[in-house]
UniProtKB/Swiss-Prot annotation:
It is found in: Cytoplasm. DNA-binding global transcriptional regulator which is involved in the adaptive response to starvation and acts by directly or indirectly controlling the expression of numerous genes in response to nutrient availability. During rapid exponential growth, CodY is highly active and represses genes whose products allow adaptation to nutrient depletion. GO terms for biological process: negative regulation of DNA-templated transcription. Belongs to the CodY family. Residues 207-226 bind DNA. The keyword Transcription regulation applies. It holds the Pfam family CodY. This is Global transcriptional regulator CodY. One of its GO terms (cellular component) is cytoplasm. It comes from Streptococcus equi subsp. zooepidemicus (strain MGCS10565). Residues 1-159 are annotated as: GAF domain.
Amino acid sequence: MPNLLQKTRKITSILQRSVDSLETELPYNTMASRLADIIDCNACIINGGGSLLGYAMKYKTNTDRVEEFFETRQFPDAYVKAASRVYDTEANLSVENELTIFPVESKDIYPDGLTTIAPIYGGGMRLGTLIIWRNDNEFSDDDLVLVEISSTVVGIQLLNLQTENLEETIRKQTAVNMAINTLSYSEMKAVAAILSELDGNEGRLTASVIADRIGITRSVIVNALRKLESAGIIESRSLGMKGTYLKVINEGIFDKLKEF
């Protein structure tokens, strides 16, 4: 049997994975699955708003109603509010406790069900909650040590993810500002007209038609598109006689045009 140190290493090895390796929809499924295997329990991770970030169900303990929470990836507001008031790990909560993960209709089926809740912090902020549960058998002190470590690891990853997202937002904003600063008034007018033609973030357009409508030359539109493409704001592809296919890859340009 793996000892506590070996189990700890399995959990902390998650930190060696880059943020880019996290799944888009349920980024912490791997952490939840690893914790569930190591501690022999069910596990889930939610953010501060109750959105599901990852889960692992080793054992069937829930009803269709509760399974729906996992399918919709959103926990009930009442439960989320109650969990947010837990500031330190609450271990081995019975099925009678308001924080039990076991549904009311399952209390008779799993009378010995136990839930443990650990808050997730990062940078001094509450970022979410880690929840684990069993049909029976208390969580030992070793189990709880692993829970504390897991919540810390997830907190670090959540903080890193927030930092990377912020850096990406700043990078995109900077790229848009630099691109806008290279455009003349006529080119800005052309860009505004072009993007208003798109169906969402992409679509087909004909430069000559737009040029005639707003009273500028076709070359102004071509120059504006080249500048945006070189700045990584858009992607374009010639469709020959059908015009040009355009796709916006930096949506910050839309916000900037609102100021125009």
